Swiss-Prot record:
<dbReference type="InterPro" id="IPR001816">
    <property type="entry name" value="Transl_elong_EFTs/EF1B"/>
</dbReference>
<dbReference type="Pfam" id="PF00889">
    <property type="entry name" value="EF_TS"/>
</dbReference>
<dbReference type="InterPro" id="IPR014039">
    <property type="entry name" value="Transl_elong_EFTs/EF1B_dimer"/>
</dbReference>
<protein>
    <recommendedName>
        <fullName>Elongation factor Ts</fullName>
    </recommendedName>
</protein>
<comment type="function">
    <text>Associates with the EF-Tu.GDP complex and induces the exchange of GDP to GTP. It remains bound to the aminoacyl-tRNA.EF-Tu.GTP complex up to the GTP hydrolysis stage on the ribosome.</text>
</comment>
<dbReference type="GO" id="GO:0005737">
    <property type="term" value="C:cytoplasm"/>
</dbReference>
<dbReference type="InterPro" id="IPR036402">
    <property type="entry name" value="EF-Ts_dimer_sf"/>
</dbReference>
<keyword id="KW-0648">Protein biosynthesis</keyword>
<feature type="region of interest" description="Involved in Mg(2+) ion dislocation from EF-Tu">
    <location>
        <begin position="80"/>
        <end position="83"/>
    </location>
</feature>
<keyword id="KW-0251">Elongation factor</keyword>
<keyword id="KW-0963">Cytoplasm</keyword>
<dbReference type="GO" id="GO:0003746">
    <property type="term" value="F:translation elongation factor activity"/>
</dbReference>
<comment type="similarity">
    <text>Belongs to the EF-Ts family.</text>
</comment>
<dbReference type="InterPro" id="IPR009060">
    <property type="entry name" value="UBA-like_sf"/>
</dbReference>
<dbReference type="InterPro" id="IPR018101">
    <property type="entry name" value="Transl_elong_Ts_CS"/>
</dbReference>
Amino acid sequence: MATITAGMVKELRETTGVGMMDCKQALSENDGNMEAAIDWLRKKGLSKAAKKAGRVAAEGLIGALTDGKKGVVVEVNSETDFVARNEQFQGLVKMIAQVALKVGDDIDAINAAPVGSVTVATAIADAIATIGENMTLRRAKLLSVENGVVASYVHGAVVEGAGKLGVLVALESTGKTDELALLGRQIAMHVAAANPQALDAASLDPELIRREKDVMADKYRQQGKPEAMIEKIVENGLKTFYKEVCLLEQAFIHDTGKSVAQAVKEAEGKVGAPIKVAAFVRYALGEGIEKQTSDFAAEVAAVSGQK
């Protein structure tokens, strides 16, 4: 039997929004397995979480930069939000994005790349020494197309091209680049707001689909539905699930009467050529990094019977 720690209960509560005692029971029933505990809570009707959500807990900035047919998004973390408002740090993030646009999204390659008379890694070290706070280049992603545009959107920008959330959208087309760029930015804004998990159903993690089907089937079995009916219900449920998590099937935020795929198809008239949404990337600052919260940890520890 796995030991259920206060940190595990805290993480599950933050992910699902379910009460601490239910979270502790879910973890106990599933031998400490976080994903299984989430599914257990969902089957009990206590949580609607589709999967473990990354909790935004780190500070710093997301930088996004595009240059026609390619674009890059980077995350540079700091210890406090105060540093994110520092002009030197903001300049560092934008410089790293410029370098990544040239050398690609491999972190080692970015750190080793020259910038002036030093490397990026040295520039980061110098900023740490000057500002007095630890910083790190956490991740980067480059998108490019042979024909078309890569558009970007930064939400909560504190300076041009840098903020709390950054999105890139790659559109493949031989049509008018100005119209493509406008559509790309609209889709990027949609991605920022709707947070799709995949481009389409075929791009979804098969394990995620399997889990979703399992949760739905078990839920309806508990309601006493006959097996012959459950299969059809689950099939319809998956269609709804896809509309919630797949970019092309989501209702377009700029016109909720149509899907993103339909909006793209309609835009082909203005663009003058077929359009394919080739890829997207969405970086939210600190997702997956957990900040220490001592008061809440103490509360959880008390419920868990730990000191």
